Amino acid sequence: MAERLGAWALGFVFAPSKRRVEPDQAAAIARRLGPFAARVGVFVDSEPEEVLRVARRAGLTALQLHGSEPPEWAAALRRHLPVIKAFRLSGPADPAWLEYPADAILVDGATPGSGKPYQPEWLGPLWSHPRLIVAGGLTAERLGELYAYGCPYAVDVSSGVESSPGRKDAQKLKAFLQASARGCG
């Protein structure tokens, strides 16, 4: 459904979460996607060997590191797949995050998946990153406020398009993707 509505990346959570999927479930979904939809695995503090094992089994094309992974892990994983490093924002962003060895950085709320937004101005110096992905409390209605501050490379949504935890709502997803497509313009 998400790809048909215009999403160009789909996330598969492999960390303990109400949205967690097994590698075989992700692989079954990934096989139904078109060739240009990114298949992103979300991991929290998993050893690089385990991440790569799951990535192969699930057919992933990118990795999102959402824990306290040391830079060395990201550097090792980048030899195999693109890496997105997620940081949790509970106040103004740390400019040092720009130095983390990742292909993109993602900024999420203090409690990922909670739907609780943060202040867009907290992103401050991160707007200079060419591949800034913004997440955290996003909804179709909130995208306009975000775009007033800057134009991220991408936006990432989960709870903002759900009818209940882990259940995507087609109407909310469609509205979000339409608002996202209008962009910063």
Task: Please describe what each predicted stretch is.
Residues 1-185:
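Conserved N-terminal beta1-alpha1 strand-loop-helix module at the mouth
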